[in-house]
Amino acid sequence: MSDSQASLRENVRLLGDCLGESMSNHLGEGFLEKVENIRLLSKNGRQSGDSAALIQALEALDDKEIVPVARAFNQFLNLSNIAEQYHRVHRRRTNESLGVYHNPVGDLLTRLSKQSFTAEQMISSLQSQSIELVLTAHPTEVVRRSLIRKYDNISSELEALDKDNILPLEETKHIRRLKEIITQAWHTDEIREDRPTPVDEAKWGFAVIEQSLWQAVPRFFRQLDEQFSEFSKEDRLPLDLAPIRFATWMGGDRDGNPNVTHKVTKEVTLLARWMAADLYIKDLNVLRSEFSMTQCNEALRARVGDSAQPYREVLRHLENKMLATKNWAKACLDGKPTSGEDIFLDIQELTDDLILCYQSLLDCGMKVIANGSLLDLIRCAATFGATLVRLDVRQDASRHIDALSAITRFYGLGDYAEWDEASRQAFLLTELNSKRPLLPMEWTPTAEVKEVLDTFAMISQGQQNSFGSYVISMASAPSDVLAVALMLKESGVGFPMRIVPLFETLADLDNAEPIIEQLFSIPWYKSYINGRQEVMIGYSDSAKDAGQIAATWGQYRAQEALTRLCKKHGIHLTLFHGRGGTVGRGGGPAHVAILSQPPGSVNGAIRVTEQGEMIRFKFGIPDIAVRSLELYCSAVMEASLIPAEPPKEEWRAIMDEMAEVGMNQYRSIIRGHEDFVPYFRATTPEQELAKLPLGSRPARRRSDGGVESLRAIPWIFAWMQIRLMLPAWLGAESALQQGVESGNLEKLREMHKKWPFFGAYLDMLDMVLAKAEPEIAEYYEKRLVGEELQGLGRLLRGKLKQVSELVKMLKKQERLIEDNKTIRQSIDVRNPYIDPLHYLQAELLYRSRKDEENAEVNKALMITMAGIASGMQNTG
């Protein structure tokens, strides 16, 4: 075992011992022995392949025991996650100290230099880079915010214990503090009593920025400065550089969420302004206290007059103005808006004055001071601006159609919803070019229509830098885009807000190119976009609609087609990737995903959603956040400067055929098998999931619908809970079998090695199959499903075995993910702790369905859901 792995195991053992002590103190040594016995039975069951003794022990638990037992395994898995997350920090620091850390940006620059790229070309690529990470609060984060804070504190204590030459007294102090925090966590309810509000979710997103990203961003820039200085004469990059920025959907995503209203969105924009001002005030205060220097250049002297402390003079002015900005935002939040005079409307004034101080320090021989915390604040200002994040607004296309229908009916023009596409476009373009208002003066819209119109009015009253894109869910025609343009115009929005169609189903992905081409043929629209087009690619719903393999190929083809189209029209395309945390929703390592995009489709710009629990895993700790930013930056630069070769035509033909076969097989089960819906509802906790207060958005689009109305997140969550992982692989077994039987085995292996797109797909499939456990899924079935439905379960498990064997054959592996020992080991270590939660959950589902009012059973059931999600390290 490496020293690195030994460190991880030691931390897991330490945290586990602290948890055991907390449980023993609370519930007695006998309870701890019972939990340990269950763990040993689980471990033995894994080794022997027979979990009968474990199942018997869990079934014997009475209703009063099940909650603490479920909590014990849930909390241990959360502590394991903390240890693993900190281990990534430990490993990086160890490698840096040994001089063996591979910085992804530095490695890329070395490769580019060897390929004759100049420093100027590389810096130019970085300067033109536009990466926007969009934080979203889909209902995937199962851990309570109060527990997240405790987990962050645990990580800090592990860091303190990791220091070389720590004194025994200090070590004792930090271990005592660990025990205290873990005991606090044990005595804290894991399950919220109420769902978080959209504002709660937004505050959590802002907290990630405050506690991690605000520190990570300047550190990331210092790494960039260091890496680029090896190839450039300059020792730092331009001060206004901002290759990565942040946006959010928290408080702006109203698609299917009636809790997100125009008032909520306005409140979130003001909260963002307040938080940004608060962060700047803290840093300005520190700078003002430190910057006692008296010598300055002529430019700064001209600004401050004969002040004896020129730097403090400027910083005091900035701090006071930022305080006024914070007070203005607070007054607006309290419903007592002030005039808003003498506040920061944008960040330019702040950065201009900070750069004035910076240049003065350089001119006066104080370079070491200039390049300290002042430079860090300049970098933060360039990245976060005056608003911290830009807020996207998302709404379903049908809501705009409903609003326009109400207006046309009022005027006696007929029903807009019933018009064909040509009639809709003609009406919209006439109104867009009209000088008279569209909205009737004496008209009372329905509450739903009024909310849509109020949202546009709210945008018009806000500032441009508070908003990102207006995303249209389920976009399927040019009129969907023009409708939003008309609403923006009618509401008096004084800036060209980006209007972004989101293509979600396979059919809409296939139609994306002709839809955008029609828009480009409209002079008004082409003038509006001013040479830049953004399109969002939906991963979740396309996979749910057609199966993962068909959806993945459909997404690739749509991006290719849009890239060609925009190049033909001289339009700069930004693709917005709506990826989730799981494979079934397009998840996976970001750098791998970016490098597997079609050649030319990245072109220096990309937007990506960072969803739910993945935000914490990728950005929750500054060290890990820096690494994540490095990976994004290097991947976008590589994809832009040295894109992969286009796939061979024969590879495309194979993918076309496999995607068709996969889609037909997937749909024949999901839509065509008469037992599918009753089987799904009986064997998974899909119905019970609605009880878990995961997020502010309802799990279903409609309360009366079947699988098609279920959102992609709970759809995947439900299958993951029983370890069948069906959305990520169903259809792939038939597709890959077809490829092999057509005599293309060696070509498929060649595609895996030489085509980044197919390589990424097969490797992600390999990983998710390694997390599947057909024996566990079978137990759920035996405990919960009638014999008349069990034939479908046997069919599905047979297909799971088939696809697993095919992946191993294609990759020449004896075992799944044999080529990724880190993930393989993580899964193997976790399984003995997750297994009891699965078997317990199946038993709880059985009890709950017999007695829905049993509070202890229902609480334990929700704890098992949270624990399994934590153990699997992803939810939906």
Curated annotation (Swiss-Prot):
- Give the residues annotated as active site: H138, K544
**Which cofactor does this sequence's record say it needs?**
Mg(2+)
Q: Which GO terms describe its molecular function?
A: magnesium ion binding; phosphoenolpyruvate carboxylase activity
Looking up Gene3D superfamilies in the UniProt record yields: Phosphoenolpyruvate/pyruvate domain (1.20.1440.90)
Which BP terms from GO are recorded? carbon fixation; oxaloacetate metabolic process; tricarboxylic acid cycle
Membrane-spanning segments:
none
Reactions catalysed, semicolon-separated, are: oxaloacetate + phosphate = phosphoenolpyruvate + hydrogencarbonate
Please tell me whether the keyword Magnesium is annotated for this protein. Answer: yes
Assigned EC number: 4.1.1.31
Q: Name one GO cellular component term.
A: cytosol
Record's InterPro entries?
Answer: PEP_COase, PEP_COase_bac/pln-type, PEP_COase_Lys_AS, PEPCASE_His_AS, Pyrv/PenolPyrv_kinase-like_dom
Family as reported in the entry's similarity comment: Belongs to the PEPCase type 1 family.
Q: What does this protein do?
A: Forms oxaloacetate, a four-carbon dicarboxylic acid source for the tricarboxylic acid cycle.
Q: Which HAMAP family match?
A: PEPcase_type1
Name the UniProt record assigns to this protein: Phosphoenolpyruvate carboxylase
Instruction: Supply the source organism for this entry.
Output: Marinomonas sp. (strain MWYL1)
